[in-house]
Amino acid sequence: MSNQVIVTNISPEVTEKQISDFFSFCGKVSNISTEKSGETQTAKIQFERPSATKTALLLQDALLGQNKIQITSEDGGAASTTDQGGAGGDQAARQEDKPRSAIISELLSRGYHLSDVTLEKSIQLDQSYGVSSKFKGILESALSGVRSVNERYHVTEKANEVDNKFAISDKLNRTSSLVSTYFHKALETAAGTSAGQKVQNAYEDGKNQLLGIHNEARRLADAKNQAEGTASPASSTPTAPAEKEPTAPTTESKTTE
């Protein structure tokens, strides 16, 4: 599969940077070009890794500006579901290595509007193939940045609990987070349909691990911000993800109808 996707039906007011920021959640963008196509825009986006391309293909019907975008791979192929995020176990974890549900959650937390189909597919893929071992390295990377303030914030003790508690029942108490709220809203919307049942089954099986990742990552990031005196309110403008540092939802988002 090509590392390039073609995105059509983009609202004319959307800038190239905004397009790049949006697709950077999928992985590193190596090149982007746009051109006018009637009353809309078409963009060609080249990713560094194939796994980012496959994640991008999940974002069909997402809103960029006022329009629902359409996404195809350069070779016209459909998204593959056979990879778990990138090869090369000795390389540092990247955005592409995150579970696709985590990437979708990040997009929602930044104010982007995604379809329920995108949510369903991301959960199903993560349920089928699990969480990349390299993604767990992201938590360790975040931890390394706050070890200098460990005595004050006891961050290490908290972080060391992560691997052992992903599947423990007390993680269910964290379902008041945005991720859980959004998932439940989506499930309610799809209630009574076969698709809704599939999403619910996949979600119920996998939510402990996903919520554990998000909440522990958020706690580490917050502790780091407090220690460095850099904590600030979440921006209302969607922005690209910071490299190598996990983020979790902090503002309310909703799905498209």
From Swiss-Prot:
Residues 75-84, 230-257 have a biased composition (Low complexity). Residues 3-76 form the RRM domain. GO terms for molecular function: RNA binding. The modification Phosphothreonine is found at residue 230. Residues 74-99, 217-257 are annotated as: Disordered. Keywords: Phosphoprotein, RNA-binding. Signal peptide: none annotated. The modification Phosphoserine is found at residues 132, 177, 232, 235. This is Protein vip1.
